[in-house]
Amino acid sequence: MKPSPIVEHDHVDGPANAPLTLIEYGDYECPYCVKAFPVLERVREAYTGKLRFVFRHVPKSGQAFDKQAAEASEFAAAQGKFWPMHAQLFALDGRHDLEQLVTAATAVGLDAAACRKALLERSFAERVRELSVAALHSGIIGTPTLFINGVRYENRIEEPLLKAAIERALAASGS
């Protein structure tokens, strides 16, 4: 299993020439993704300048608002606010309804009425569907799934374990 190459529409944080690339396939309603979020945030901060982080949606829970949370993040992305919205959605602890999604959008400076309209009209549904299909084509069947420099991370998402894997990847890259 390999992640697909990073493309223009991916959600990327960090320098393109970073020696490390960490890709997360995740879902805003997955309890394991919610638990992993603060660990990944601390790792991103610890490796600032050395790490390029990519988040890819894999809405899988089947809950009513599962895909809608991903759509809300895409609405935010269209306005340059993906990462703040990403944090807001994980802060909701996997519990989303339309009003919570709109509130999250306003918390990051987005227009409530525009967000509500985009979600009700499913303006970003096709984008989320395409991302889900791409993840399936890459062999992703569960969340969270992580790759460090293209190699699947197979351990628990705990800070010391993840940092050890990152350090090994850094050493292997010669950085």
Walk through the language-model features, giving the residues of each:
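N-terminal targeting signals for export/organelle localization
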Residues: 1-4, 175
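A short beta-strand-turn-helix
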Residues: 3-20
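Generic hydrophobic-segment detector
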Residues: 4, 62-63, 70, 125, ...
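Short clusters of hydrophobic/aromatic residues that line enzyme substrate/ligand-binding pockets
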Residues: 12-13, 96, 153
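Structural alpha/beta surface segment adjacent to cysteine/selenocysteine redox centers
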Residues: 18, 23-106, 111, 116, ...
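C-terminal cap of thioredoxin/glutaredoxin-like
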Residues: 25-26, 32-44, 103-175
